[in-house]
């Protein structure tokens, strides 16, 4: 699809949205929770409509309810049918031919964020992640979404995985994003005229910098000290447009630790956005293209690195997605996972200057639940002298980003964003560490000026004097250090 066609399509969807009746939204106030029974307005059927679901994935479920406190959709909707337990009950009823997959039933599956917090919480080992991933394609086949939902999702899938298209649509917004004009549009209520989905897109739009519109990192980025290894780096589609500083900081940290970083200029999307939506044909196509791209790099690689947890989660699933027919020649690792395993070089440790700031840790769902990565980011950041890491009370609860969830389910996502922002803000931290671009945009929207949100690689690069970090007080990083190794701390100096 050409860029002008995309712009026309977006304009047409805006007209449709402005002219349509106000969409009936789900109330965010607490509703009486169900008892686990199928609600009375759900249509009964005579035969199964969801063939191909994973055998036995739901069998261990004993309806204990341990998943409910961790479930983000249940948190804001308080409806049994919008919980893992309720959805499993519905799946069993559909498979037994007792329930029809109609629009009402489909809507309860659409409220699932796919955060997998329930998988971590389940004491019986129910693989809800497998169930919801297998169900999403069935929802598309069933055709139970309204025309606006279908068109809007397809528009997002035609734009977000393609940086060139996304940049073309962002070009006219360069004079708007991050300017007083944007503040005026928001304060006047103008953005609400376009409907909740488009308003959510506008609310997430960050200031656009020149680096948002072109990839400026070289293909080969040599190690800055004695070479320890060689890695490839995925730039990410949304991240390279909306937060390009993350990739720059990541490359600098890797170089300073003795790694040559290869960035294939023709790399495409990893397929994470389409994967989360159940668009499996597009996902497999994008995955196969990326595998070919990374495997075409001359010379051996120690790893294919990712700096966005949503991308990493999908790339680690390529073996299953591509049925083992194509696979990376090097292991896929999150950059924090990689550095925690290899360790910082002695030269890099000596470079680290104090960052005497309180930093709240945000665990992206596809990091903590999807990949089991939680200790590594903390391990790396604790190497920074003077840093104080703060933990959120509800670290495992989703922030509401969840791929494109905050665009297609904007009201529920906004409520979750407010809950997460309040939780992080209550730590007293002035900085938040977030390793996923979707989470970062969501948190920046809801935290406002209460805290600045940055990738852990940016914090490390700033401490090493390799990166300018907005949001840090003037002079941080310039103090004297006393002590050795992990005992290095900032000390007062005479002014």
Language-model segments: residues:
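Low-complexity, intrinsically disordered or signal/transmembrane-proximal segments
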Residues: 13, 37-40, 489
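Short, intrinsically disordered, charge-biased short linear motifs at domain edges
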Residues: 45-58, 98-109, 255-258, 384-389
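Non-heme iron-sulfur electron-transfer modules
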Residues: 38-50, 74-107, 125-154, 450-459
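Iron-sulfur cluster-binding electron-transfer modules in prokaryotic oxidoreductases
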Residues: 3, 128-495
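Extreme N-terminal basic, low-complexity initiation segments
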Residues: 1-12
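Short terminal hydrophobic/aromatic SLiMs and anchors at protein ends
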Residues: 5, 16-18, 23, 39
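Cysteine-centered iron-sulfur cluster-binding motifs in ferredoxin-type domains/subunits
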Residues: 54-74, 102, 106-126, 366, ...
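Compositionally biased, low-complexity intrinsically disordered regions
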Residues: 11-13, 25, 33
């Amino acid at each position: 699809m050409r860029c002008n066609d995309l712009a026309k399509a977006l304009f047409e969807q805006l007209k449709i949205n402005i002219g349509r009746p106000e969409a009936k939204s789900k109330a965010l106030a607490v509703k009486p929770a169900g008892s686990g029974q199928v609600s009375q307005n759900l249509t009964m059927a005579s035969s199964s409509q969801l063939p191909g679901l994973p055998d036995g994935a739901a069998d261990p479920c004993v309806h204990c309810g341990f998943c409910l406190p961790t479930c983000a959709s249940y948190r804001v909707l308080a409806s049994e049918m919008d919980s893992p337990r309720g959805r499993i009950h519905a799946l069993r009823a559909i498979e037994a031919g007792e329930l029809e997959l109609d629009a009402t039933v489909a809507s309860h599956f659409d409220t699932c964020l796919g955060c997998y917090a329930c998988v971590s919480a389940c004491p019986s080992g129910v693989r809800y992640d497998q169930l919801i991933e297998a169900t999403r394609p069935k929802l598309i086949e069933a055709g139970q979404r309204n025309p606006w939902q279908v068109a809007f999702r397809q528009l997002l899938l035609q734009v977000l995985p393609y940086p060139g298209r996304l940049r073309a649509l962002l070009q006219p917004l360069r004079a708007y994003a991050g300017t007083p004009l944007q503040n005026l549009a928001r304060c006047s209520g103008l953005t609400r005229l376009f409907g909740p989905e488009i308003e959510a897109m506008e609310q997430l739009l960050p200031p656009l910098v020149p680096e948002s519109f072109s990839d400026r990192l070289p293909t080969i980025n040599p190690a800055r000290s004695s070479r320890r290894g060689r890695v490839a780096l995925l730039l990410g589609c949304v991240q390279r447009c909306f937060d390009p500083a993350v990739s720059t900081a990541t490359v600098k940290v890797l170089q300073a630790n003795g790694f040559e970083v290869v960035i294939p200029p023709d790399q495409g999307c990893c397929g994470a956005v389409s994967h989360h939506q159940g668009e499996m044909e597009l996902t497999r196509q994008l995955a196969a293209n990326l595998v070919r791209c990374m495997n075409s790099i001359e010379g051996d690689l120690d790893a294919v690195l990712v700096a966005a947890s949503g991308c990493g989660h999908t790339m680690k699933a390529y073996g299953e997605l591509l049925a083992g027919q194509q696979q990376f020649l090097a292991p896929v690792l999150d950059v924090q996972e990689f550095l925690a395993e290899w360790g910082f070089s002695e030269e890099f440790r000596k470079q680290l200057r104090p960052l005497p700031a309180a930093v709240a840790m945000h665990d992206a769902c596809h990091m903590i639940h999807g990949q089991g990565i939680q200790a590594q980011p903390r391990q790396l950041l604790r190497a920074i002298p003077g840093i104080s890491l703060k933990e959120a009370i509800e670290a495992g609860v989703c922030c509401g980003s969840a791929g494109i969830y905050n665009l297609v389910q904007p009201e529920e996502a906004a409520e979750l964003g407010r809950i997460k922002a309040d939780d992080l803000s209550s730590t007293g931290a002035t900085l938040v560490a977030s390793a996923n671009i979707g989470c970062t945009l969501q948190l920046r929207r809801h935290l406002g000026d209460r805290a600045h949100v940055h990738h852990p690689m940016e914090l490390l690069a700033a401490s090493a004097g390799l990166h300018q970090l907005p949001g840090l007080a003037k002079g941080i990083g310039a103090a004297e250090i006393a002590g050795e190794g992990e005992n290095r701390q900032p000390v007062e100096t005479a002014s």
